[in-house]
Amino acid sequence: KVAVVERGAIVAMAPGVAKVLATVDGKMATLHVIVGKNQVPPISLRNEVIPVLSRQGCSSGACHGSPKGKGGFRLSLRGFDLSVDETTLRGEFFARRVSVLDPDSSLLLRKPLMHVPHAGGQRLHSDSVSHHVLRNWIVQGRQTDSAVAPRCVSLQIYPPSGRQLTRQAPNQQFV
């Protein structure tokens, strides 16, 4: 796949050309997407992998983010301690939990897809961006971030005055 669309966002997955067709209220628009070889950066452990695990609930206190983890797998609570998570995710070389030799056999992918029993239930779908992030990080060799990797230094939410829902608009768009 060149790109995937999830929740309205187009995410580059591999070099190539794709066409995206969007329809809303009977109106259609077509967008041509070109992903070049240099446009697919390595998956970031800090900025992508850890947030995926947090978003899926894996690093919550009720799951692997608890002080002792679950099932021998421990993550820091909500991804707070990158060194703990890095040790857990990268420390088992040639292990079954995260296998660079056969990424699809990694328990990090198989359990949340429910390919093997998982007490936490299904947390991923094979066509989701979250699954692609985790799988591609493993395929790329479970690399840690370089010293020059981008870091989030601030976050601004718009509108700045906060939530402004009205009865006619039950959802609020934040940018």
Which residues make up each language-model segment?
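Aromatic- and Gly/Pro-enriched helix-to-coil junctions and flexible linker segments
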Residues: K1-V175
